[in-house]
Amino acid sequence: MSQSGFAQFGRAYIDRLEVAARQIPLAPVEQLAEALLGCWRERRQFFIFGNGGSAGNAIHLANDYLYGISRVTGHALRVHALPANSAVLTCLANDEGYEHIFAHQLAVLAQPGDVALAFSGSGNSPNVLRALECCKTRGVRSFAVLGYSGGKAKALADVPIHVAIDDMQISEDLQLVIGHMLMQWLYEHRDQAR
C-alpha cells in the first residue's frame, strides 16, 4: 500500500464526479441537442467559448464536432471555438478590452438562428457575460454549462445547464461529459442532419 494514499484520493474524486454527473439536468441538454441537430441540418453556425480550462474544452469539442463527426459522415457542424485564435484574442483584448474578446467575434460572425454555448465554472466572467448579451442582440440562441451558483450567466443564457458543484475541476469535467454526450447523440442522429 502506498503511503501517499493516492488510490483513496482518486476513488473519492471519481465518486464526487459520479455524483455531480448524475445531477446534470437532461432536459436543457436535450434542448441543446435538438438545437445543434437543427443547426447542423440547416447549415447554421455553432459557437463555443469559455476561459482557461473551459476554453480548452471549447477547442477540444470544436474538434470533435468538426472532425470527429465529419470523418465518418462526410459533413459536420459549422463550429467555431472562439478562444482558439490567439492573434484575434490578443488583438481584441488589447484594443477593445478583455471583456469583449468573445462578443466582438460574435458581432462579426453570428447570424440569427445560430447557436452559442458558453462554458463557465462561476458564470460571472465578464467576457462570457458580454458574449451572452451579444447573442441576445444578434438573435443567437444561447446555452451555458455552469457550475457553482450559476452566476449572472444563469439568467443571461436562453437555456442554462447548471450543476451546483463548488469544484472547478469537476465543473470542467462535466463540460466535457455533456459535450461528448452531445457528440455521440448527434452521430447517432446523423441521418436527420441531411
Model-derived regions, located:
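Generic N-terminal amphipathic, Lys/Arg-enriched alpha-helix
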Residues: 1-24
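A short, well-structured juxtamembrane/interface segment
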Residues: 22-42
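Glycine-rich, small/polar surface segments that engage phosphate groups of diverse ligands
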Residues: 38-110
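Short glycine/serine/threonine-rich phosphate/pyrophosphate-binding segments
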Residues: 54-59, 124-131, 153
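A charged, well-structured terminal subsegment
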Residues: 108, 170-194
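Short, glycine/polar-rich helix-capping loops at beta-to-alpha or helix-loop-helix junctions
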Residues: 145-157
